[in-house]
Every structure is written in structure tokens, then in C-alpha cells.
């Protein structure tokens, strides 16, 4: 803790120079201050107003209906991560101004109630409100962005952005969404909003020439990297062990267990086995159960506040929230969303895509993941370095929060050579979301400070 505070003091001295020899620089924005701050705001004030993440944790991600959380209710999943972010920072829960939870499948009023229950399970008092947000697969990231925006607006000082999904408890409709407005059939774009996600994956593969081999290779790499991350033990930094139970489906006997490892990863995944799988959504297509994300159970939570408050409390800073963007794309190829959202988010942060050191891009389907990476000409050694949703799983509402925890802990491990990171995902009905983060301790002696090449205007 003392070392973290000393690092912050070092940066403060750089941002608030007293030597007259530096007077010519006093009107220039700090390299680490928000790129769009107005001229009246001093670098010192802008620095203190940064929205920072002081804790980000997740549960393990488990196979729906077959994995370690198959008999764990969503409010119990959420409670575990809500409790972790306050206990591990020694924060008084009553100081939290709001808890925003991303969640997708469950009926809205039911899940809102469950999230309030989870807050009580985690020890939060009556005074702390809770709400849910649903922007499909970006819901967890949207929750974090909503909290960051509310803190910046002055609505409250401390907030938690979280996500939860129990796809064991709540199921995606197998036959599509019922009760849609019949008028949608008269509007092609509206009709395309109702397409099964797997068909949109096939559309991306066909329109942009993503081959079955490319998709299977991406799947193998995802499992390989996830297995290596688990074997190394590095994911213990971000995963909260959850004490729960599993129920034998035949005898109904209950067994107490502790879940702390992602259980959908297949270390022996290989091209030969994947090539044997039949396509799922279209005859002679290319999307299979092996190169698409898994349905999963899990939760994540992210604790945010202003940098000035974090420093006052002596909390080490894990990351800085720099920008967030959501963009619309054609519903029939919704998976291309990251290819549009990532440049939008980096531009808002005053950066170019080439300035980003690490990416977490949700692998909803290998087709759209491969396309997005190729379109942006990304260095694949910087993308999903610990595996992605094909291997780990995709609990819809929790994925955004899971990615924040994974990205920021990996950036911390990499140190001074990893300053900026991006999280992105596609969104059903045709959207993409992306956020830019800066490593929290990137101010160590300003050893890695560099001028961003992007246009900040």
C-alpha cells in the first residue's frame, strides 16, 4: 500500500512542477490526463478527476447445466463478487452510491429483485441502491461505463459495475423470440433483429470470407491459451473462489464444493477433432459447437471511484477508465461490431488502435472474432492472451465485467510495457461496444509515458 501511494506522489510531482524552468510547459496537457479536458482545468485537477478501478473480480466461468455452478442461483453468484470488491479493499459498503448489474436472459423485474437480494447477501445496507442494465452481450461492460459516467457527473462518489448470468437457471429461447411485432416482417432491418445469432455468424463468414479452418484455428488457440493461463495459476488474481453445492441429478444428493477454476476449457482441443463437428445453424455452413462460445454461468464486479478519493483512502489503482463507445451495425452481421466500436472508443480516448497494448475481444463466434481482428489488423499476440469465450465461456450479462477483471490484472502483470487496453464485444440486433482502459500504476517513475498518436479532437 505504501509503495502504491509513493507511486502516486511521484506522478503528482511530475504533473504539478514547481521549477520555473518548466513554466513553458504549464499550459500543455499531461500525457496521463484526460485528452479532452478543457483548458480551464489544470492537469492536477484532471488527474484527480480520473475515474479509476480499485478492484475487479470474477467468479470462475462454468458450463451451464453441466458445470460447477449448475445448481447455484444467480443471486448467490453475484453476492460472491459484490462481497469481494468491498472486503478486499476494506471499503465500508455504506459508501457505495449505486450498484449497476448487467444481465440479459432473465425477466427484468425478477432479475432486478435477485440483484437487490444479492446485495443484502453481500452485506450492503438498505441505503445502497441496485439496478440492472441490459444491452445484450455488452451488459456487464455497459454497467461499468454507466457507473463511470455517474461518478464523473457527480451523482455519487463510489459505485460498482457488475454482471451476472446463470444460463443454467435461465435459457435462451430455442425457437427464437416469440411475441414479436408482426410488422417487423415488413421492415428488413427489423426482421433481421430476430435472426438467431448463429445465422448472423454464418452471414459474417460468408460475406467476409472467413473460412471454417480459420474459425477452428481460432478455437484451438483460445483453448490453448486458456489452459496455459489456468496451469500457470495467474487467474487466481482475478477469480473469487465460491463455496457452493452440486446436486446429483439421479439421487438428488448434495455435495459441498468450492469452485475456483473455469471448467469449460479443453486443453486437448485440436483441429482434427474440430473438423469432425457438424455445423449447427446452416447446412454446409461453418459455425459449429466447437468454434462458438459456450453457454455459461458466472459473475463479475468492478469497484470504481475518482482517483483523488482512491488516493485519499490509500487504495492501489488497478486501472483508469478512459473511454467507452457503442456503435450500430447491420443486424444480419451483428458480429462485426468490435471492428467498428474499437476505433470509435480509441478515438474518444485520443488514441489510435495501434496504441493499444492488449485486447479482450469477446469470442461470441470465431467467425466474427476472426473478422474483427483481421479488419483492424491486430497483432494476435496482443489479443485474448489468456483465451476467450470459446474456451472460457460466455455468461452473457457477466462477460463485460469478466473481461475488465481479466484485462486489468493481465496489464498489471505485464507492467510498464502495457499501458493501454481495450475490451470489446458484438451485440445482438446489430451493435458493438468497446472501452479503453489505462494501466493504473503506469505512472511508475513515468518510465513508460509516451505521446499518444491519435487525434483527440
Swiss-Prot record:
Its Enzyme Commission number(s) read 2.3.1.16
Q: What CDD domains does the database record attribute to this sequence?
A: thiolase
What name is this protein filed under? 3-ketoacyl-CoA thiolase 5, peroxisomal
> Family per UniProt?
Belongs to the thiolase-like superfamily. Thiolase family.
GO cellular component assignments: peroxisome
- SUPFAM superfamilies in UniProt: Thiolase-like
Name the species this protein comes from.
Answer: Arabidopsis thaliana
The molecular function GO annotations come to: acetyl-CoA C-acyltransferase activity
Q: Which gene encodes it?
A: KAT5
This entry's comment on induction and repression of expression is: Induced by jasmonic acid (JA) and systemically by wounding. Slightly induced by dehydration.
The function of this protein is:
Probably involved in long chain fatty-acid beta-oxidation prior to gluconeogenesis during germination and subsequent seedling growth. Involved in systemic jasmonic acid (JA) biosynthesis after wounding and may be during senescence.
Amino acid at each position: 500500500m505504501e509503495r502504491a501511494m509513493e507511486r502516486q506522489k511521484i506522478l503528482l510531482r511530475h504533473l504539478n512542477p514547481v521549477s520555473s524552468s518548466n513554466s513553458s510547459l504549464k499550459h500543455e496537457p499531461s500525457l496521463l490526463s484526460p485528452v479532452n479536458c478543457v483548458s480551464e482545468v489544470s492537469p492536477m485537477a484532471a488527474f484527480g478527476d480520473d475515474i479509476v478501478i480499485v478492484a475487479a473480480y470474477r467468479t470462475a466461468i462454468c458450463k451451464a447445466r453441466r458445470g460447477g455452478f449448475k445448481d447455484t442461483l444467480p443471486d448467490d453468484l453475484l453476492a460472491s463478487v459484490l462481497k469481494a470488491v468491498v472486503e478486499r479493499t476494506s471499503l465500508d459498503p455504506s459508501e457505495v452510491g449505486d450498484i449497476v448489474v448487467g444481465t440479459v436472459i432473465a425477466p427484468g423485474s425478477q432479475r432486478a429483485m435477485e440483484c437487490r437480494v444479492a446485495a443484502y447477501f453481500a452485506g450492503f445496507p438498505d441505503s445502497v441502491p441496485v439496478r440492472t442494465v441490459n444491452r445484450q452481450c455488452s451488459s456487464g461492460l455497459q454497467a461499468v461505463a454507466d457507473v463511470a459516467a455517474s461518478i464523473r457527473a457527480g451523482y455519487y462518489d463510489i459505485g460498482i459495475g457488475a454482471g451476472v448470468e446463470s444460463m443454467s437457471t435461465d435459457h435462451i429461447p430455442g425457437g427464437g423470440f416469440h411475441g414479436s411485432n408482426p410488422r417487423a416482417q415488413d421492415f428488413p432491418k427489423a426482421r433481421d433483429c430476430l435472426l438467431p445469432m448463429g445465422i448472423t455468424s454464418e452471414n459474417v463468414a460468408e460475406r467476409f470470407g472467413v473460412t471454417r479452418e480459420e474459425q477452428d484455428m481460432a478455437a484451438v488457440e483460445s483453448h490453448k491459451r486458456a489452459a496455459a493461463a489456468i496451469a500457470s495459476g495467474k487467474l487466481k488474481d482475478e477469480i473469487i473462489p465460491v463455496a457452493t453445492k452440486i446436486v446429483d441429478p439421479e439421487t438428488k444428493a448434495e455435495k459441498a464444493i468450492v469452485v475456483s477454476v473455469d471448467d469449460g476449457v479443453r486443453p486437448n482441443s485440436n483441429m482434427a477433432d474440430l473438423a469432425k463437428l457438424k455445423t449447427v445453424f446452416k447446412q454446409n455452413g461453418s459455425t459449429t459447437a466447437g468454434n462458438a462460445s459456450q453457454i455459461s454461468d458466472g459473475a463479475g464486479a468492478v469497484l470504481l471511484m475518482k482517483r483523488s478519493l482512491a488516493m485519499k483512502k490509500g487504495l492501489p489503482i488497478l486501472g483508469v477508465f478512459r473511454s467507452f463507445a457503442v456503435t450500430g451495425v447491420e443486424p444480419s452481421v451483428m458480429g462485426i461490431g468490435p471492428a467498428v466500436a474499437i476505433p470509435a472508443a480509441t478515438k474518444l480516448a485520443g488514441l489510435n488502435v495501434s496504441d493499444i497494448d492488449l485486447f479482450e475481444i469477446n469470442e461470441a463466434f470465431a467467425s466474427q472474432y476472426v473478422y474483427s481482428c483481421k479488419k483492424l489488423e491486430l497483432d494476435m499476440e496482443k489479443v485474448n492472451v489468456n483465451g476467450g469465450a470459446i474456451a472460457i465461456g460466455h455468461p452473457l450479462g457477466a462477460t463485460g465485467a469478466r473481461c475488465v477483471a481479466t484485462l486489468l490484472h493481465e496489464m498489471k502483470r505485464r507492467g510498464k510495457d502495457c499501458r493501454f487496453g481495450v475490451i470489446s464485444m458484438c451485440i445482438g440486433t446489430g451493435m458493438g461496444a468497446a472501452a479503453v482502459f489505462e494501466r493504473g500504476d503506469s505512472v511508475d517513475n513515468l518510465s513508460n509515458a509516451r505521446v499518444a498518436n491519435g487525434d483527440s479532437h
